[in-house]
Design a protein with these regions (language model features):
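Conserved SGNH/GDSL esterase-like catalytic core that processes O-acyl groups on lipids
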Residues: 12-16, 22-101, 106, 112
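Extracytoplasmic/secreted proteins, especially bacterial periplasmic and envelope-associated proteins
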Residues: 17, 27-34, 63, 91, ...
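Structured segments of extracytoplasmic/periplasmic soluble domains
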Residues: 21, 25, 31-39, 79, ...
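Conserved catalytic region of serine esterases and O-acyltransferases that act on ester linkages
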Residues: 11, 182, 189, 193, ...
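Alpha-helical cap/lid subdomain in secreted, periplasmic
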Residues: 67-188, 192
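Conserved beta-strand termini and adjacent loop/short-helix elements that scaffold enzyme active sites
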Residues: 46-50, 119, 166, 331
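Bacterial Sec-dependent N-terminal signal peptides
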Residues: 1-10, 256, 314, 325
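C-terminal outer-membrane/trafficking sorting elements
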Residues: 257-331
Length: 331
């Protein structure tokens, strides 16, 4: 459960948004920042959101790649072109999933502790008329929304990343209060109400705190604000593990003594099959997910892990009076 936290738990996050018009309409990152600020938190963000951009486009966009590598982001939000993830499973697996994987790999290579967050969008109000004949399941809003959910869940599960279920919050809002219009006049892009709901979902997803009773309203009525906050909160908390929130901790650091010159440890590749490399040469221990010691040694720059079974492990690296634990996957 995501609960409201006091002033001693204020957080600062650095987040990069890579998407398109669904992200830049109504300036979604700024809405999230304003909600965070009202709760004493700080969102430092950058974005690259050219209209209609796909994951493939971002992978081949020098600006997007440069921004990923520009600093150690806490989170990078990836939003696909609005229709593409709703296409047939075979088409999504061939056309979209490979670039979700490639972008996630670049993000993790830049900062192994970064979290990739897949921004699940919403179906068009009356389905995708332009692609209905070619793929009838997306002829309706519900059919399109179901495919979006499945695809974004696929992206998140495949890369061991987070899914921010904005589209599921839209689904719940529409079911409970169909008269509250979330769409703009084109029945695709968000009205301010839709962007505010999405921002509430993202605040809870990124900061792991409750949005309930947040005082930032974006100029919306108190009634609508309260309703949208509750919808976002309910959707997040009903299914935290479905959205992979807290399921795949990318980095766990246990500092016995804080040391200003502790090395910035990177492990690669992750996932891996035979060998795990680090950018240090420190004593190491490898534990399985149950905390059982599986391997240990004195030099961590190249570790043979062929003896490990497939699964999730943690490597613990020791440096003076400090230890760092990092999660990795053996395939």
């Amino acid at each position: 459960m995501l609960n409201g936290l006091n002033a001693q738990n204020h957080k600062t996050l650095k987040v990069l948004f890579l998407g398109n018009s669904y992200t830049y309409v109504n300036n979604l990152p700024q809405l999230i920042k304003d909600i965070a600020l009202a709760n004493g938190d700080t969102l430092l963000f950058d974005s690259n959101c050219p209209g209609g951009h796909t994951f493939n486009n971002h992978f081949n966009n020098a600006t997007s790649i440069s921004k990923i590598n520009s600093q150690a982001w806490d989170c990078v939000v990836l939003q696909a072109q609005s229709q593409e993830p709703s296409f047939s499973p075979a088409q999504v697996e061939a056309q979209t999933l490979p670039y979700a994987i490639k972008l996630d790999s670049i993000i993790k290579h830049n900062n192994i502790c970064a979290e990739t967050v897949f921004f699940e969008t919403w179906g068009r109000k009356n389905g995708d008329a332009s692609n209905c004949a070619a793929y009838p399941p997306i002829c309706t809003y519900i059919g399109m929304q179901n495919r979006l959910r499945s695809s974004y869940k696929l992206f998140a599960d495949t890369t061991h990343s987070i899914m921010s279920p904005a589209g599921e919050a839209w689904r719940k809002s529409i079911a409970l209060n169909p008269n509250l219009e979330l769409y703009s006049s084109d029945q695709s892009h968000p009205a301010l109400e839709g962007s505010y709901l999405t921002a509430c979902v993202f605040y809870e997803t990124l900061f792991h705190k409750s949005v309930l009773s947040n005082t930032y309203t974006a100029g919306l009525s108190a009634t609508n604000v309260g309703f949208l906050q509750q919808v976002a909160h309910d959707v997040l908390n009903d299914s935290l593990l479905v959205w992979n929130i807290g399921k795949y901790p990318s980095c766990i650091t246990t500092d016995l003594t804080e040391i200003s010159y502790q090395p910035n440890v990177i492990i690669y590749p992750n996932p891996t099959q035979k060998t795990l490399h680090t950018n240090t040469n420190l004593p190491f221990k490898i534990y399985d997910i149950l905390g059982i010691l599986c391997l240990s040694g004195n030099k961590s720059n190249s570790i043979n892990i062929e003896s490990l079974k497939s699964g999730v492990y943690f490597i613990e690296l020791s440096y003076l009076n400090s230890t760092k634990k990092i999660r990795f996957v053996k395939e």
